[in-house]
């Protein structure tokens, strides 16, 4: 087993048998920067959310999930500190996008809105204040950059 990748909040280990282990840490990442402070058990919460969606959508889209049960992990990952943080997955080719669901007028979306510009193909007819809840959430994908910053893209770009 070897470390395959170290991301902003996850560590990926290659079991060299067609499977990988992903460990979700308590690191905080904002605007593509890892912050020096950690949030206790943040990794467990992120992992639980990801596991929920992998399970919920498994009949809609295939995914890499094999198990999140600690007893199914290789011995090195069956320690208490890995409980709730690990998933065992199939080693597949990654589709290099992430999908962001935005429910509030904030960040780069708010900056574009203030200038009267559409945000990744989304136009807003209503007047919004910064951090105000949107009438309907919007989906804004971005690239999943191996290095450097992720880049916002449109759904059409992904097709």
Locate predicted features.
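Active-site loop/lid in soluble adenylation, ligation, and acyl-transfer enzymes
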Residues: 1-142
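A short mid-domain helix/strand-loop element embedded in enzyme catalytic domains
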Residues: 133-159
């Amino acid at each position: 087993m070897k470390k395959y990748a170290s991301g902003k909040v996850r560590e990926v280990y290659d079991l060299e048998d067609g499977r990988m282990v992903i460990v979700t840490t308590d690191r905080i990442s904002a605007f593509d920067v890892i912050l020096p402070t950690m949030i206790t058990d943040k990794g467990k919460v992120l992992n639980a959310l990801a596991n929920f969606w992998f399970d919920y959508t498994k009949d809609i889209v295939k995914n890499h999930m094999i198990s999140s049960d600690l007893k199914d992990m290789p011995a090195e990952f069956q320690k208490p500190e890995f409980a709730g943080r690990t998933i065992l997955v199939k080693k597949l080719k990654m589709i290099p996008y992430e999908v962001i669901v935005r429910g509030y007028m904030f960040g780069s979306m708010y900056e574009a809105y203030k200038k009267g510009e559409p945000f990744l193909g989304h136009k807003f007819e209503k007047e919004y204040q910064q951090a105000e809840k949107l009438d309907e959430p919007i989906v804004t994908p971005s690239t999943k950059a191996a290095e450097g910053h992720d880049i916002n893209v449109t759904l059409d770009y992904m097709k």
